[in-house]
Regions:
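A short beta-strand motif characteristic of beta-propeller blades
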Residues: 72-90, 125-131, 167-175, 219-230, ...
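Beta-propeller domains
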Residues: 49-87, 111-125
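Repeated scaffold domains used in trafficking and secretory/extracellular systems
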Residues: 87-101, 134-143, 177-184, 229-243, ...
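Short coil/turn segments that connect the beta-strands within blades of beta-propeller domains
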Residues: 42-44, 105-107, 145-147, 188-190, ...
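Intrinsically disordered, low-complexity segments enriched in Gly and acidic/Ser/Thr residues
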Residues: 233-235, 239-310
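Bacterial Sec-dependent N-terminal signal peptides
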Residues: 1-40
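Short loop/turn segments immediately following beta-strands, especially the blade-tip
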Residues: 60-68, 162-167, 209-219, 261-268
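Short loop/turn segments immediately following the C-termini of beta-strands
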Residues: 51-53, 61, 112-114, 152-155, ...
């Protein structure tokens, strides 16, 4: 296995099944009647979790052919040389989440996979903290104090592990949330955005958690004033809305939405209710980038992921207004999650 290899431009800039109601869908991205020559797309590099190669892979959106050697600017998987145990290496299946964050002028990445999580130095890929954790981990976020937040869809919890206390720290605090799928730190409101189901009412929700206590003994408390019931079931992704700190991207099995932190309401995203979107974000230009499983597209793409029904070989690009622009296809890939590689919290 290889270390993370990143070009100089990149630094400037989740595989687990979603086991909930992952049925077939007849909605497909609108395609232009005329096939145009692929265009380079400016913006941050894109991180993809690839179950086929069992690697986190970094791609340059300015390169139009992602099967070309210069398209993939970085890749990572755990190795003993990087400081990981044999158990962690064997469990890593390509990732379910990957976020790059800069803290005190040092850049790290937080990542999750089905049954392990880690914080690594970026771009070296060296282990900072890691742990084998059951529960079908779907999302990870590095907190400004060095701790790590995790969401487990089968474990039905949000946890904060005290990674700030050492590379092998196993202390954590837990907030019960059924089918938990996403964690995202908000530096303005100083809270953690999460998606899942209310344990008591079974409602599908987006909500915010305050992190109190100390770095060594954190506490999680829901900020109920920010809770919103999702318009459709099975919340999945929560990501930053580049260019507007008052908004968030939120996806579910039934559609994708924009959450307004002031009004505490959800509205339909410009892409107009695509379903089963596993990862979604926008570039500073406003361009939208997302991934949907090939199994949920009709017709299914000729080049597609045949290994499972929750991944894809295709990354789709849309204008800020929701018009399909084009795609990048990687032969043999099984991408589950896409992340805009912006190291800044927002």
């Amino acid at each position: 296995m290889k270390k993370l290899i990143i070009s100089g431009a990149v630094l400037c800039a989740t595989i687990a099944a979603c086991s909930k109601n992952n049925g077939n869908d007849t909605t497909a991205p609108p395609k232009p009647s005329i096939v145009n020559t692929p265009e380079p797309y400016p913006g941050f590099p894109l991180a993809l979790t690839n179950g086929a190669t069992k690697q986190i892979e970094i791609y340059d959106p300015m390169v139009t052919d992602w099967n070309a050697a210069n398209a993939k600017t970085g890749r990572w998987s755990p190795t003993t040389t990087l400081g990981f145990s044999t158990d962690e290496i064997n469990r890593f299946g390509g990732g379910t989440d990957f976020k790059v964050r800069t803290i005190n002028s040092i850049t790290y990445a937080a990542l999750a996979d089905n049954s392990m999580a880690a914080i690594i130095a970026y771009p070296s890929g060296q282990r900072v903290w890691s742990k084998v954790i059951s529960g079908n981990l779907h999302s990870a976020e590095l907190l400004p104090n060095g701790n790590i937040a995790l969401a487990a869809s089968d474990g039905n919890w949000i946890r904060v592990y005290t990674a700030s206390q050492g590379a092998n720290s196993s202390t954590y605090t837990e907030f019960p949330l059924a089918a938990a799928h996403a964690v995202l730190w908000d530096p303005q409101l100083r809270c953690l955005w999460v998606t899942g189901r209310d344990v008591a009412t079974k409602a599908h929700i987006l909500t915010a958690l305050a992190i109190g206590g100390t770095d060594a003994a954190p506490e999680l408390t829901e900020l109920t004033q920010y809770r919103a019931t999702l318009p459709t079931a099975w919340g999945h992704e929560v990501s930053a809305y580049q260019g507007n700190k008052n908004l968030l991207w939120v996806t579910t099995n039934g559609g994708e939405y924009v959450y307004n932190k002031t009004t505490k309401t959800l509205s339909m995203a410009p892409t107009n209710n695509l379903t089963f979107v596993k990862g979604m974000g926008n570039q500073p230009s406003g361009q939208l980038v997302l991934v949907r499983p090939d199994a949920n597209k009709n017709p299914r793409p000729q080049i597609s992921c045949s290994a499972n029904d929750w991944s894809t070989s295709t990354i789709d690009f849309y204008t800020a207004g929701g018009q399909w622009q084009g795609s990048r296809v990687v032969n043999g890939a099984c991408f589950y999650k896409v992340k805009i590689l912006d190291a800044n919290y927002q």
